[in-house]
UniProtKB/Swiss-Prot annotation:
HAMAP family: Ribosomal_uS19 (MF_00531)
NCBIfam families: rpsS_bact
MF terms (GO), sorted A to Z: rRNA binding; structural constituent of ribosome
The species this protein was found in: Alkaliphilus metalliredigens (strain QYMF)
Function as written in the Swiss-Prot or TrEMBL entry: Protein S19 forms a complex with S13 that binds strongly to the 16S ribosomal RNA.
Protein name: Small ribosomal subunit protein uS19
Classification via Gene3D superfamilies: 30s Ribosomal Protein S19, Chain A
Amino acid sequence: MSRSAKKGPFIHKGLLRKIEEMNEKDEKKVIKVWSRASTIFPQMIGHTIAVHDGRKHVPVYVTEDMVGHKLGEFALTRTYRGHDDDEKTSKRK
């Protein structure tokens, strides 16, 4: 279920404040964020945001294609190592 249109997109207030301050000063620093639910706004394009994945901060460089998506979509929380090739099960069949 998507968010109600009358509420508008969610973004952490501190993150938005930091982005606006950096845009005024023309700075491009890495911003550490724990708010994976924040929506990516057009003001964030060109910035690198370090999104927390539960263990560490994963650097995410924001491009135009990412606008409207959530920050958490680009920092995976689970490591997929693939399925094991178990030779015993394949020989039985």
